[in-house]
Amino acid sequence: MSKVLFVKANDRPAEQAVSSKMYETFVSTYKEANPNTEITELDLFALDLPYYGNIAISGGYKRSQGMELTAEEEKAVATVDQYLNQFLEADKVVFAFPLWNFTVPAPLITYISYLSQAGKTFKYTANGPEGLAGGKKVVVLGARGSDYSSEQMAPMEMAVNYVTTVLGFWGITNPETVVIEGHNQYPDRSQQIVEEGLEKVKKVAAKF
C-alpha cells in the first residue's frame, strides 16, 4: 500500500484562497480514486512548527559527533527527525501553497529546513551535492494572484521555483506542477482561470 503525504501551507479558507481550494480539490479527488491508500495530511500553520535555528542545528551537529545534547536540543532534533522520517517514508508527496510577497509562507520554509538534511535527503560528494530522495512521486500545487509568465515578472516568482529547486537538490527532478495564476490581475477572467486550473488539479489527482 502506497503512503501518501499531503502538505498544505495556507491557513486561509478555500473560499478565499485558491491554493487552499486546489489542496481540497486534489485531496478529495485522490481519496475518491484511491480509497485504500494510507494518507497523512499536514497543515503546517496548525502544527506551529518551531523555527529551524541554532538549537536544532547545534543538536544535529552534536549528535553526529557523539556529543551530549541538552534537553532543548534533544526536543528540537526529535521534532526534525519526526517530519524528516515521515517524508522519507512516503511514496508520494503533494505540496500546496500560495505565493505571498514573492515567496512561500514561512511555515513551509521551516518545514523544508527540517527535511533538507545532509545524509538523508542529499549527500556531499567530490563532484558536488547529490540528491537521495529521487524515488518519490511529487506534485506541486501553487497559486499566485498575479501573472508571472512574462519575462519581466518570471524572476520574481520565488515560490514554485523555490520548492522545485529544493526538490531537485534532493534528487526529485520531475515533480508534476499545477499553477493557477492571474486570477487577481485579470478580474474579468478570474472565475474562468480558477475553474480551468481546478480541472487540471482533478486530472492530476485522478492519475497520481
Curated annotation (Swiss-Prot):
From what superkingdom does this record's organism come? Bacteria
Under catalytic activity, the entry for this protein gives: 2 a quinone + NADH + H(+) = 2 a 1,4-benzosemiquinone + NAD(+); N,N-dimethyl-1,4-phenylenediamine + anthranilate + 2 NAD(+) = 2-(4-dimethylaminophenyl)diazenylbenzoate + 2 NADH + 2 H(+)
**Described function:** Quinone reductase that provides resistance to thiol-specific stress caused by electrophilic quinones. Also exhibits azoreductase activity. Catalyzes the reductive cleavage of the azo bond in aromatic azo compounds to the corresponding amines.
Record gene name? azoR2
Which UniProt keywords are present, listed alphabetically? Flavoprotein, FMN, NAD, Oxidoreductase
This chain belongs to the protein called FMN-dependent NADH:quinone oxidoreductase 2
Names of required cofactors: FMN
The cross-references to InterPro entries, in alphabetical order and at most eight, read: Flavodoxin_fold, Flavoprotein-like_sf, FMN-dep_NADH:Q_OxRdtase_AzoR1, NADH:quinone_OxRdtase_FMN_depd
The UniProt entry's sequence similarity note says:
Belongs to the azoreductase type 1 family.
Read off the Gene3D superfamilies from this record: 3.40.50.360
Q: Which HAMAP family match?
A: Azoreductase_type1
Q: What detail does the entry give on cofactor binding?
A: Binds 1 FMN per subunit.
Say yes or no: keyword Flavoprotein present: yes
Signal peptide location = none
Which organism is this entry from?
Answer: Bacillus cereus (strain ATCC 10987 / NRS 248)
Q: EC?
A: 1.6.5.-, 1.7.1.17
Q: Which Pfam families match?
A: Flavodoxin_2
Alphabetically, the GO molecular function entries are: electron transfer activity; FMN binding; oxidoreductase activity, acting on NAD(P)H as acceptor; oxidoreductase activity, acting on NAD(P)H, quinone or similar compound as acceptor
Assembly, per entry: Homodimer.
